[in-house]
Amino acid sequence: MFLLAGFLGCIYKYHEKEIVLEFGMFTGSNWDVASASSFVMIDKAIAKFEEEHPGVRIHYYSGISKEDYSEWCARKLLEGKMPDVFMVPDTDFNLYSSLGVMKNLDELIEHDAGFNRNDFFTTALDAGKYDGHQCALPYETVPVLLFVNKSLLAKEQIEVPGEDWTWDDMYEICRKITKDVNGDGLLDQFGTYNYSWRNAVYTSGGRFYDGDQQQLPFTDSHVLDAIKYMKRLNDLNQGQSVTQEDFNKGNVAFMPLTFAEYRTYKTYPYRIKKYTRFQWDCITFPAGKEGENRSRVDSLLMGINSNTKHEKLAWEFLKHLTGNEEMQMDIFRYSQGVSVLKSVTGSAQAAAIIQEDMDEGEQVINSSLLYNVIENGVIEAKYQQYEQVMNLADGEISKILMENRNADSSMKIFQRSITKYLQQQR
């Protein structure tokens, strides 16, 4: 009798054996700003999931920095111990997708009646696509906005631009702002700092790469228009270099800034360390003649190990992190990013959370502006040669601007060298 009871007990325990899902994550912020709460929202999400799924435990390794995470993943991959669900580094997304490290989610999405693609921002969801297939889901997103020094504009009796302003509008503002204030023969005020030709291309109506991630020519008219526009802006500075110190002192009108930086430096305690000498806010980027008021949008992605033994649970956990409104609201509570769900980011609750830590009288960024900037944003390519090519282009265009070279002929020569370079990489 006792033997039978013991045998039945063993069978019961076997069926009730705990399932452990491995989760891969790094500490801190994905957006290179200070963050002490990255584990809080993950731990809350895990606790909720485990509560809803008795017998399931989520395990992760703490203390892995963003800088070390890619190497940690590579080591786990070689050991055959890749986590069931994991954060996907931007630099590894295309490699992992092409090698089949991440599960193609198309079938899981198609057979899940509760999953709706339209719940997500288009740019955020598209960031997780490879070769037309959904290989990862977005967890958090951050757009680049344009920082405007409202105090400097007010001093020069210039109104803050509206959401649909243009390159010409920006040029005129910069022309009025740029001046020698103290009469020592050197400029003291400037229009822009760190505004680049890439920012201009995004708003020119052109793109660096098409949907298949084939390189568009650097001799494309939109790219050339952006470079020539940058030359006009650069000429206003009369050969002087604009520095971060100029900006910090309140002597520059515009500077690109991520939403993560906006939230960090608008709230305590970091607001007392930066940009306290003047009033500032964020607006859209100006549009070229054939372009729109667009900017880059980055997303933190999560995928499922293609070799997971717990596909259904891994899918449920991935959805729990990325598609659950309660979990996504915690992005606003504990991170400097933005929720990937339209309903959350556009909500009054999200706006109230952002407003909580701001000084009285500070106006929170317009939620409709934030919504539109993300939905209509630009996704940068993730494949290996992209940043190498763009860095080479940065150097070439810097020479065009600094040495007063002809943009058309210089970019034709550059295009030939880049085409040859890419052919050698294949």
Regions found by a protein language model. Give the residues of each.
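Extracytoplasmic/periplasmic substrate-recognition and gating elements
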Residues: 25, 235, 272-342, 378-379
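Extracytoplasmic/periplasmic solute-binding protein
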Residues: 130-139, 144, 168-216, 252-254
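Paired acidic/hydrophobic, glycine-rich loop segments that form the ligand-binding mouth/hinge
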Residues: 84-87, 253-258, 263-265, 276
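Glycine-centered hinge/linker elements that transmit conformational signals in sensory
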Residues: 173-174, 212-241, 285
